[in-house]
């Protein structure tokens, strides 16, 4: 406390203005008056000095146009309030404006001043307005335009000028003040004459902590100063005279050069306040005084630093460079050589870099973003010294398929390496490692297969490879419930942008992949108009067009088109945007329908560019997603700090990105003010509405040279702004941004500064070792710096350079050791500072890939395949390899695969190319940091601060149908070509019609190649059935059978159809079909799905095919359709205790609503109160490995059960070997969630610490070790240390949302004590201290855990007292009380019973607790994983306890008897007649669980949760399900509410069979949800605000895991398409909590879905 008081006193004394000097220094004014300001001194001044031809041109352009006043506003110009009148056409500059335009102050009379006319002759300006004045502005009708037009009448308007509050602040947030080139520290002042400034030097040992807490803010609040100023010493206090011009915001410099206390090396904090004022918060800035420029290139293992003089750009020798961690400890240091270069080891803990010499200090924060190099072509795969090329035959799989991965290991130059094992990790979409294996090569090829579970989570999966260098390589693949496409669709527009007057046309080509045109097929689609903000790909980040323009985003038209006999068509739309001045794009989203309604969807875009050139704007600060209170939506837009300067890059560019020269760009800063009010209407009640007022805050003119990027900056306060740039051709571009909104930021957006660009040009397309590179370097300005040749491992060559205005030509010899392909040339050129011109140092960067690819090592691979073949035949691929020089390569290995193009087209899969992988351009491998973005500029432009992350939940709602999808994928074994470079591979092709892409990869020890070819697979007559993905019992559907004659002869065919399984034909099948050559016909087949769960099958026999010279057998085809019940599965539970002689029978109506064929059950009979251990194991086994708690809970049964025990319980389990392997995997997963401090987090080690779960997981790991599993000692030790910390320092625990923090901490401490005591590692003193806080316990469980720990460690007395108290302390039954221990009354009782039995304590109390627990468990229909595991642990300890019983049952003629509980699995017939009689002389406990599918929709129900479903069209309007046509898109809107916070809600919306999801994870092949109407966009905005953890698009359901806050509705939206005509039952939507399963809801039932053709 004493230190805090001292710091506070020091700050107060400092703020009192105690000057160390007798005379206050005077601030230096550095802003030279602008030409406009000078002109203001004349009576009627004009800055418009135009030549006669220029005047004539302007007059001609405005000929015949009317003169009107467009705007009359107060604007800030050169820091002063200015009245600006904007006219529609140029004014005559020769008239006396003071005679025709008058400004009168209502209080003081006429306002004196001179009118200034802008260069474009359209704006009149009157400067230096007084604040808070009512001004009457009168414009006489005599005002004359250049074309001689005049006002029709006099104009008068009253405006009130803004209030001006005295203000002062630092004008730069840069941290480096180059004293040799900048005279002082810049400040911005308005009507403040004197300031007191206090300078603090940050203590060296506190520097990293200070920087971390400072966060580069621009003010220091009093409450922040207590903590921050403890880390700094006050070294100087001074008063400075500013004396800015009255009512004018001026930039001035505080002279620091003669202040001796600031000449000591260090980092300083300046805190400023207006003299004589004491504010809650004061302007502050952090800076160092230094001439040392620093740039750093950060690689994987090293850090290369270059130091230069800010004064002259020369390399600086003898600079001491140090790396510091966040604790201020020096990690490593070195001194720069003659070239200014320092090499340091890259330490992941490095937070700061300090460069010091002769009292100067430069600070580089390595925690800030690296330099943004988006404008450079530096993309590619990462470069490594060991290259591991991973590839497969495809990157899209369905759950249940087997993933295939191949790999080649080479060095950086593609040369073979010795064989070595490589570790592969299979990673789920949630980031969890599912399996780790070690792969060994065979003949140089690594091969790995991974069978996906049938319920594998959908999304993006990864296989991660580690070659031993701990640099991970990733191979990504999709897992989705997709259907292979049968057709191809090509949509094309014009490649170059159109003008706004042009008609937009898209050509359409559709064909079946087996070769026939899609003639007669329907094309449905939509045409959308959208603004094209980032319109120029060559200028990333620049936005073009007026963001305030209205009606630029809308749906243009719906498309319905039938393709011609060649499968072609055209879609066109006339321009409805001829007057636009902003870039636009027309998007055509087209869906080509099969005869059964299933689509193939593609998109095409047509750009529209409205002028020769347009202004482009790029903010120099980050865009972030924030909640916009004005629109009640989440928006992404740039965010800048309140009270700072908002800086922007400006270009004037054509559509190709060529920067044009321009004079007179008008740049305006506009504040968007909204005045809200309430409005009442009969239809909508009270609605919040607003009036928007655009206030012009500031304005300046900008001239740009060709190929120049201009920069502007403006001071901003809190609020919403728009920056607007208007070109001489009237084109306007604008961007919106927020100031002062970062506190509501909910993203990790970071503003990485883009540097100016150095242009690098090479003299050759590629080089070889021994060549000489001729490099031309052209910098924006002359300067010094360095040029480098870099690899991903570090620099290979560098040289100091001096670039003149005309550029520099440099020769670089290519060293023969540069045998790698991740090389880049990079340059940094620094413009030296110049005090005389107030020019601060400025940096430009160049990066260019250095190609060293050797075409001589490319294998030419020829594939000979048939152009066409029939199904059910082998495909032989002949291969021939050769080299560029014609020689026959030796020992060529080839891997051949053939894959259905209908799979590859969905993801645009590119045939893997090993040559490109090893020799192609790699990603630039360095992160560049430098201080040039932090230099404080003397003339006031703000320098930017920064240079430049399965599961059976799906079965909730019932098992999914089995979907039979024929996916053709064949990968042959590798073959070695013969001495002539030739070989062949034969692949079996089954019953498939379509297109195969044959892909081949070839390699030798040094050379590589690849190729592909297409093969059409088609029968002479093709029969393809179009059917829904599944059906529900009771559905009727109209299947379509397409029969295509691909022969050149007419065919008379007989088609016989039958159905079996769970399908029946509704009408007789067709008999005869006649087809001309090339003709396709469609047969309609009505079917009905029967009750049950399983498959239905359609069989077709096609006979009569006549082929010349062939005897053709009948063609037999079968298609299976998965059938499931229409409504979610339900469970009923019965239980009783029968006394001797009593009989129990199932109630007559108990199973009445169940479909008999789906009904199954389990009967448990026991001589003691039963716990259904089989149920608990099943539920835990069914639960996915997910978060920390789920993973641990799911593993416990595998510790204590084996395959024989599971079989005895009626559970299908894995072998003991697989069971032990799954535990090993689970342990690995748990350890991935262990934090560095030994605790555990919920999802990964970077998450927040979970205190109770840390004890829970440590309990499991200790038990696993006891059961013989390998648990790393280090992990156990670190976990134990963390548990010990819980015992000894409970104050360090922060448990969010805990309703009883003391009880939560007591629960954590007690469990930690038990786990440590189990290992004899719990300090008895700590246990006794916890016992003293026993009154904090909110449940008996922690008291029992503490009691067992006390007894174990030797304090039997306190232990027994704790155990006795535990049995008298029930848990509060209110589930809404959160204690942070994942508990419930049921869970606690179960763990207490388990503890008592494990430790052989109180057998009578055990029996009482068992009886209570049995009743509790029986009453719970749904259990959390915590409860299931606790019940398992309790049941496993008591299942062997004796309890004789005897029973007679209706399903067994023999009498049943036993001493242990017995489970019997029952079918539907046994269940509906079930009777049980107690034929023994002891009580008999009975539990019966039956589950099945209801025959009718369940009634809506809700407990805590509530769910509603709405069906909309893509226009956002309500749509009925009984009036859809095949191909129609519908939007499904789910709204979920909760009366308590539910962080783990799982939403399952089962689909009716006639609808199919448009999978947004497969954007290339699905209709886009984003391309919808305005109402739909509002719903999408609401959805963006939801905390959605996971979304899945399945064959028969939409699934989302989402957090639902109390009384805050969650919106979920998905897109579906009506496909197969028919009548379908509509299931209800469901939602439930995964941890409190009784919190659940079922939505209202819907009418039938009717899909018409």
From Swiss-Prot:
GO-annotated cellular components: extracellular space; plasma membrane
Coiled-coil features, chain-numbered ranges: 1559-1589
Main location: membrane
UniProt subcellular location: Cell inner membrane
Transmembrane segments: none
InterPro entries: A2M_bMG2, A2M_N_BRD, A2MG_CUB, A2MG_MG1, A2MG_proteobact, Alpha-macroglob_thiol-ester_cl, Alpha-macroglobulin_TED, Alpha_2_Macroglob_MG3
Domain of life per record: Bacteria
Pfam families, per database record: A2M, A2M_bMG2, A2M_BRD, bMG1, bMG10, bMG3, bMG5, bMG6
Extent of the signal sequence: 1-17
Lipidation (S-diacylglycerol cysteine): 18
Membrane disposition: Lipid-anchor
Covalent cross-link site, Isoglutamyl cysteine thioester (Cys-Gln): 1187-1190
GO biological process: defense response
Swiss-Prot/TrEMBL keywords: Cell inner membrane, Cell membrane, Coiled coil, Lipoprotein, Membrane, Palmitate, Protease inhibitor, Signal, Thioester bond
Residues covalently joined to lipid (N-palmitoyl cysteine): 18
One term of GO molecular function: protein homodimerization activity
Biological function: Protects the bacterial cell from host peptidases. Acts by a 'trapping' mechanism. Cleavage of the bait-region domain by host peptidases leads to a global conformational change, which results in entrapment of the host peptidase and activation of the thioester bond that covalently binds the attacking host peptidase. Trapped peptidases are still active except against very large substrates. May protect the entire periplam, including the lipoproteins anchored to the periplasmic side of the outer membrane, against intruding endopeptidases.
Swiss-Prot/TrEMBL domain comment: Cleavage causes major structural rearrangement of more than half the 13-domain structure from a native to a compact induced form.
Subunit structure: May form homooligomers.
Misc: Bacterial alpha-2-macroglobulins were probably acquired one or more times by horizontal gene transfer from metazoan hosts.
Family to which the UniProt record says this protein belongs: Belongs to the protease inhibitor I39 (alpha-2-macroglobulin) family. Bacterial alpha-2-macroglobulin subfamily.
Protein name, entry field: Alpha-2-macroglobulin
Chain's gene name: yfhM
């Amino acid at each position: 406390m004493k230190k805090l008081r001292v710091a506070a006193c020091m700050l107060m004394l400092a703020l009192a203005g105690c000057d160390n000097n007798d005379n206050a220094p005077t601030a230096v004014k550095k802003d030279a008056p602008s030409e406009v300001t000078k002109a203001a001194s004349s009576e009627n001044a004009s800055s418009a000095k135009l030549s006669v031809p220029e005047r004539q041109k302007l007059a001609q352009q405005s000929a015949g146009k009317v003169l009107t006043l467009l705007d009359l506003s107060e604007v800030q110009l050169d820091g002063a309030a200015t009245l600006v009148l904007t006219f529609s056409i140029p004014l005559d500059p020769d008239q006396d404006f003071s005679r025709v335009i008058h400004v009168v102050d209502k209080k003081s009379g006429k306002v004196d001043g001179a009118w200034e006319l802008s260069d474009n002759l359209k704006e009149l300006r009157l400067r230096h307005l007084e604040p808070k004045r009512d001004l009457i502005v009168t414009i006489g009708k005599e005002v004359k335009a250049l074309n001689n037009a005049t006002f029709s009448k006099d104009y008068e308007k009253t405006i009130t000028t803004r209030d001006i509050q005295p203000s002062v602040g630092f004008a730069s947030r840069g941290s480096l003040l180059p004293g040799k080139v900048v005279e002082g520290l810049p400040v911005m002042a308005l009507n403040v004459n004197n300031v007191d400034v206090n300078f603090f030097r940050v203590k060296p040992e506190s520097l990293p902590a200070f920087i971390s807490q400072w966060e580069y803010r621009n003010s220091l609040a009093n409450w922040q100063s207590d903590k921050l100023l403890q880390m700094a010493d006050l070294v100087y206090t001074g008063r400075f005279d500013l004396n800015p011009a009255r009512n004018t915001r001026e930039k001035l410099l505080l002279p620091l050069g003669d202040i001796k206390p600031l000449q000591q090396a260090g980092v300083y904090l300046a805190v400023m306040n207006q003299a004589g004022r004491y504010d809650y918060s004061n302007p502050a800035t952090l800076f160092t005084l230094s001439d040392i420029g620093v740039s750093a290139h950060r690689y994987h293992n090293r850090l290369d630093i270059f130091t230069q003089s800010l004064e002259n750009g020369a390399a600086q020798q003898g600079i001491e460079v140090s790396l510091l961690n966040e604790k201020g400890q020096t990690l490593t240091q070195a001194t720069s050589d003659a070239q200014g270069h320092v090499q340091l080891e890259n330490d992941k803990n490095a937070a700061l870099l300090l460069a010091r010499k002769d009292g100067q200090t430069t600070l580089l924060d390595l925690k800030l973003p690296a330099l943004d190099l988006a404008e450079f072509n530096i993309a590619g795969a990462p470069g490594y010294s060991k290259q591991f090329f991973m590839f497969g035959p495809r990157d899209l799989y369905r759950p249940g398929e087997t993933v295939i991965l191949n790999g080649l290991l080479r060095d950086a130059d593609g040369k073979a390496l010795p064989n070595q094992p490589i570790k592969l990790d299979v990673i789920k979409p949630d980031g969890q490692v599912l399996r780790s294996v070690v792969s060994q090569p065979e003949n140089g090829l690594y091969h790995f297969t991974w069978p996906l579970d049938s319920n594998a989570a959908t999304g993006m999966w990864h296989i991660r490879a580690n070659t031993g260098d701990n640099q991970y390589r990733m191979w990504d693949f999709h897992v989705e419930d997709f259907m292979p496409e049968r057709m191809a669709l090509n949509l094309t527009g014009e490649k170059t942008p159109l003008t706004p007057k042009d008609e937009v046309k898209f050509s359409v080509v559709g064909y079946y992949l087996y070769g026939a045109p899609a003639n007669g097929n329907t094309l449905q689609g939509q045409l959308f108009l959208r603004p094209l903000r980032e319109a120029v790909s060559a200028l990333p980040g620049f936005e073009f067009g007026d963001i305030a323009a209205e009606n630029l985003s809308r749906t243009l038209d719906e498309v319905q088109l039938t393709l011609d006999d060649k499968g072609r068509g055209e879609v066109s739309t006339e321009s409805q945007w001829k007057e636009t001045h902003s870039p636009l794009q027309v998007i055509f989203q087209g869906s080509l329908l099969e005869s059964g309604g299933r689509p193939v969807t593609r998109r095409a875009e047509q750009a529209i560019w409205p002028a020769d050139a347009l202004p482009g704007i790029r903010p120099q600060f980050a865009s972030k997603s924030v909640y916009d209170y004005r629109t009640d939506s989440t928006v992404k837009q740039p965010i800048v700090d309140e009270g700072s300067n908002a800086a922007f890059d400006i270009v004037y560019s054509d559509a190709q990105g060529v920067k044009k020269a321009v004079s007179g760009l008008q740049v305006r800063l506009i504040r968007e003010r909204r005045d809200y009010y309430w409005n009442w209407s009969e239809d909508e009640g009270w609605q919040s509405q607003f009036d928007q007022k655009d206030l012009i805050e500031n304005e300046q003119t900008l001239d740009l040279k060709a190929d120049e990027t201009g920069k502007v900056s403006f001071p901003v306060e809190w609020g919403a702004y728009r920056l607007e740039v208007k070109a001489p051709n009237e084109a306007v571009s604008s961007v919106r941004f927020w100031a002062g909104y970062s506190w509501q930021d909910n993203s990790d957006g970071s503003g990485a500064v883009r540097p100016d660009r150095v242009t690098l040009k090479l003299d050759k397309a590629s080089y070889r070792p021994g060549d000489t590179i001729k490099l031309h370097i052209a910098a924006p300005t002359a300067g010094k710096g360095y040029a480098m040749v870099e690899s991903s491992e570090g620099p290979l060559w560098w040289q100091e350079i001096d670039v003149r205005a005309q550029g520099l030509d440099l020769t670089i010899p290519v060293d023969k050791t540069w045998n790698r392909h991740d090389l880049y040339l990079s340059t940094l050129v620094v413009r030296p500072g110049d005090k005389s011109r107030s020019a601060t140092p400025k940096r430009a960067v160049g990066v260019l890939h250095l190609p060293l690819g050797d075409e001589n090592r490319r294998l030419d691979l020829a594939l000979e395949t048939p152009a066409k073949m029939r199904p059910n035949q082998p495909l032989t691929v002949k291969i021939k390899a050769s080299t560029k020089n014609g020689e026959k390569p030796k020992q060529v290995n080839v891997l051949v695969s053939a894959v259905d193009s209908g799979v590859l087209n969905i993801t645009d899969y590119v045939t893997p190319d090993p040559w490109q992988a090893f020799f192609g351009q790699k990603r630039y491998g360095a992160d560049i940091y430098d201080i040039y973005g932090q230099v404080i500029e003397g003339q006031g432009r703000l320098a930017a601060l920064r240079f430049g992350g399965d599961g059976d939940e799906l079965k909730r709602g019932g098992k999914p149908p089995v979907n039979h999808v024929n996916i053709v994928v064949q990968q042959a074994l590798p073959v070695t070509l013969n001495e002539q470079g030739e070989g062949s591979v034969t692949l079996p092709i089954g019953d498939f019609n379509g297109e195969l892409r044959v892909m081949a990869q070839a390699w030798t020890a040094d050379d590589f190649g690849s190729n592909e070819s297409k093969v059409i697979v088609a029968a002479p007559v093709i029969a393809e059935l179009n059917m829904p993905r599944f059906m529900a019992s009771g559905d009727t559907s109209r299947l379509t059978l397409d029969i295509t004659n691909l022969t050149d002869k007419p065919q008379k065919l007989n088609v016989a159809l039958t159905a079996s399984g769970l399908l029946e034909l509704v009408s007789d099948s067709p008999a005869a079909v006649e087809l001309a050559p090339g003709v396709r016909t469609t047969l309609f087949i009505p079917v009905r799905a029967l009750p049950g769960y399983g498959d239905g099958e359609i069989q077709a026999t096609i006979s009569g095919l006549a082929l010349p010279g062939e005897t053709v057998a009948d063609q037999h085809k079968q298609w299976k359709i998965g059938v499931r019940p229409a409504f979610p599965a339900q469970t009923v539970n019965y239980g009783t205790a029968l006394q001797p002689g009593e009989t129990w029978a199932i109630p007559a109506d108990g199973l009445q609503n169940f479909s008999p064929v789906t009904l199954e059950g389990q009967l448990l009979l026991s001589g003691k109160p039963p716990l259904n251990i089989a149920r608990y194991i099943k539920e835990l086994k069914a639960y996915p490995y997910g978060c920390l708690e789920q993973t641990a809970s799911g593993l416990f049964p595998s510790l204590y059960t084996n395959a024989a025990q599971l079989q005895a319980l009626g559970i299908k389990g894995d072998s003991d070997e697989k069971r032990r392997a799954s535990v090993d995997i689970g342990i690995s997963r748990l350890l991935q969630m262990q934090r560095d401090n030994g605790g555990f987090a919920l999802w990964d080690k970077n998450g927040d610490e979970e205190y109770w779960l840390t004890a829970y997981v440590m309990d499991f790991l200790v038990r696993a070790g006891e059961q013989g599993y390998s648990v790393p000692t280090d992990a156990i030790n670190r976990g134990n240390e963390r548990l010990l910390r819980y015992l000894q320092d409970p104050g360090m625990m922060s448990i969010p949302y805990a309703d009883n923090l003391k009880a939560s901490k007591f629960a954590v401490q007690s469990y930690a004590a038990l786990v440590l005591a189990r290992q004899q590692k719990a300090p008895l003193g700590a246990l006794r201290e916890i016992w003293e806080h026993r009154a904090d316990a909110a449940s008996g469980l922690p008291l029992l855990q503490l009691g067992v720990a006390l007894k174990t460690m030797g304090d039997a007395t306190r232990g027994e007292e704790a155990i006795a108290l535990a049995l008298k302390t029930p848990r509060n039954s209110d589930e809404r009380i959160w204690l942070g221990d994942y508990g419930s009354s049921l869970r606690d009782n179960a763990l207490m019973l388990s503890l008592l039995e494990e430790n052989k304590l109180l057998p009578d109390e055990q029996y009482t607790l068992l009886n209570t627990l049995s009743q509790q468990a029986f009453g719970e229909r749904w259990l959390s994983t915590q409860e299931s595991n606790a019940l398992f642990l309790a049941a496993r300890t008591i299942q062997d306890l004796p309890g004789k019983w005897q029973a007679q049952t209706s399903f067994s003629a023999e009498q049943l008897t036993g001493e242990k509980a017995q489970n019997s699995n029952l079918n539907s017939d046994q269940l509906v007649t079930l009777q049980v009689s107690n034929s023994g002389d002891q009580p008999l406990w009975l539990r019966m669980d039956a589950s099945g599918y209801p025959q009718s929709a369940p009634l809506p129900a809700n407990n805590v949760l509530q769910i509603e479903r709405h069906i909309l069209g893509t226009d956002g309007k309500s749509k009925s399900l009984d009036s859809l046509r095949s191909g129609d898109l519908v939007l499904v809107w789910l709204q979920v509410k909760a009366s308590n916070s539910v962080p783990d809600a799982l939403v399952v919306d089962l689909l009716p069979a006639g609808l199919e999801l448009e999978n947004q994870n497969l954007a290339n092949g699905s209709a886009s949800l984003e391309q919808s109407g305005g109402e739909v966009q509002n719903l999408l905005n609401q959805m963006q605000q939801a905390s959605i953890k996971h979304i899945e698009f399945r064959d028969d359901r939409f699934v989302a895991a989402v957090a639902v806050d109390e009384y805050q509705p969650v919106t979920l939206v998905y897109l579906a398409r009506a496909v197969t005509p028919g009548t379908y039952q509509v299931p209800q939507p469901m939602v439930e909590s995964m941890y409190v399963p009784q919190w659940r809801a079922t939505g209202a039932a819907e009418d039938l879905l009717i899909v018409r053709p």
